Amino acid sequence: MVSVDVVGAAGVPALWYILKQNQAPSGMVYSGCLILPFTNSFFTLQLMCMETGITGIREAIVMDRFIASGVSIRELSESATRFEHGTAKGHYSPDAPEHDVQFPNHPLSRVRRYFRDVLSVLSIKGVY
């Protein structure tokens, strides 16, 4: 899991999460899912972006920047073993949103950007 958040979607509180899964033969698929709960049902909107071409560039560049900043490999590996609420805590996080601006065509950046676009125009008609 990359992230999970409660967001406002057309005036309704909703759950938004992003999953990262391996794809064959290489690369990752990033899947964003918006779940809108209603009285007797729920609505799910899913958006998937796949990695194509050369993969791992975002991760390699972010890692290189952390190493260049003086963070040791040992610190990175030790921080990856610390968990808080089921999520690894540490310095190295190539999936963090702050890297999206540097990698706008990365599938994770696109999932987040498309999700913001959907939220900006989403409307719900009728009573559910």
Regions found by a protein language model. Name each.
Residues M1-F43, L47-T55, E59-A60:
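Signature of long, low-cysteine stretches enriched in small and polar/charged residues
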Residues C49-Y128:
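Surface-exposed amphipathic alpha-helical segments
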